[in-house]
């Protein structure tokens, strides 16, 4: 039979081996509270990005002029940047995976190249009348630098979604 000490305070304390287990709820409580607080902005990153892509596709289907296409591309860029702005770690992971896809299937004529610089229309004709052949859209040559991650990722995602259309 086990005898207790005279002060009886040690009888109420847990054994030394169990003391660290008593701290476990204090360690687990903050992550559980954060999870129970509800979804954060990063939980909807894919949904938001998909909505930006759908808007891009809808606006590209409305007109085929370069100015309209580039305006749609710029709107997509702004939309995607806004969706991803609050989630830098998640956005970095998404962009990295999409960049890997883009590297595997590069496209020479892409929206980044077409819309990366302002379009200038230069008139070649000498008379007051011109036709379509005398107007040419030109853009300054882009430096040979890697495309920004957002643009490369968007191109990769558009390439991946191409068979669905």
From Swiss-Prot:
Residues 1-35 form the signal peptide. It comes from the Eukaryota. GO terms for cellular component: axon; extracellular region; extracellular space; plasma membrane; side of membrane. One of its GO terms (molecular function) is identical protein binding. It is a lipid-anchor; GPI-anchor. It is found in: Cell membrane. Residues 140-165 form a propeptide. A lipid is attached at residue 139 (GPI-anchor amidated alanine). Keywords: Cell membrane, Glycoprotein, GPI-anchor, Lipoprotein, Membrane, Signal. GO terms for biological process: neuron projection extension. InterPro entries: Neuritin_fam (IPR026144). Its main location: membrane. Pfam families: NRN1. Belongs to the neuritin family. This is Neuritin-like protein. It comes from Homo sapiens (Human). The gene is NRN1L.
């Amino acid at each position: 039979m086990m005898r207790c000490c005279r002060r009886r305070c040690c009888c109420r304390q847990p054994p030394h081996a169990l003391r660290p287990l008593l701290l476990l709820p204090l360690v687990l409580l903050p992550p559980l509270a954060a999870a129970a607080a509800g979804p954060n902005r990063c939980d909807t990153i894919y949904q938001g990005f998909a909505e930006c892509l759908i808007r891009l596709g809808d606006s590209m289907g409305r007109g085929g002029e370069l100015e309209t296409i580039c305006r749609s591309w710029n709107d997509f860029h702004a939309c995607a940047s806004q969706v991803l702005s609050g989630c830098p770690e998640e956005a970095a992971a998404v962009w990295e995976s999409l960049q890997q896809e883009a590297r595997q299937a590069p496209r020479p004529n892409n929206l980044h190249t077409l819309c990366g610089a302002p379009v200038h229309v230069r008139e070649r004709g000498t008379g007051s009348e011109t036709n379509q052949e005398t107007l040419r859209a030109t853009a300054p040559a882009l430096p040979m630098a890697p495309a920004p991650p957002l643009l490369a990722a968007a191109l990769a995602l558009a390439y991946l979604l191409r068979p669905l259309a």
